[in-house]
Amino acid sequence: MAHAEEPEDRMAWIEPEVRPGSLLVSSTDLTEPAFRRTVIYMIEHNDAGSLGVIVNRPSETAVQNVLPQWSPLTAHPSALYIGGPVKRDSALCLGIARNGARIDGVAGLRRVDGKVVMVDLDSDPEVIAPLVEGIRIFAGYSGWTLGQLDSELEREDWMVISSLPSDVLTPPRVDVWARVLRRQPLPVAMLASHPIEVERN
């Protein structure tokens, strides 16, 4: 099920601290393959640690092949995304609530921030379908122990930026990393033109 993207010119600003719903956008100096040019949507950030999923790493595995009951609700492409290096044999699901949908108290849904919800993949898709515009399923997640993410932020590995709901379901033809940076004021917006392969320039 396709999700209508929000206007790209809507601003989502750099945030002073991490919270559920924040984006972690990798810096141009972060060259570790697992996180290079990644955008992570943060689901939890508390005294127990931090957890999020990479929203711009589609795999070649179709949702139909692993969780066929959820395939009709999955935004294009109907592929499993790589949420991060932790517990790659497990799955997490984010969805975008429909305008006006009353999701609080609905079994199988938990609000993360605004219209973005966590979907329990053990719940009934027929119950969830009328309430969401689309979902994205992630294999694994990105996790940090208490204080670990703070250290990475101090090293300036990540920029903390507020999200738009459309960031979660953006199709792979869109460079999410560059698009999020273009929404920022100068000079941060200029980073969006950073070459993908520096060694080629």
Curated annotation (Swiss-Prot):
- Chain segments annotated as transmembrane: none
Matching entries from Pfam families are given as: DUF179
What do the Gene Ontology cellular component annotations say?
cytosol
List the SUPFAM superfamilies hit by this protein, alphabetically: VC0467-like
Q: Which Gene3D superfamilies match?
A: VC0467-like (3.40.1740.10)
Question: Which InterPro entries does the entry link to?
Answer: AlgH-like
- Family to which this protein belongs: Belongs to the UPF0301 (AlgH) family.
Q: Which NCBIfam families match?
A: PRK00228.2-1, PRK00228.2-4
Q: What is this protein called?
A: UPF0301 protein RER_60040
The top of its lineage is: Bacteria, Bacillati, Actinomycetota, Actinomycetes, Mycobacteriales
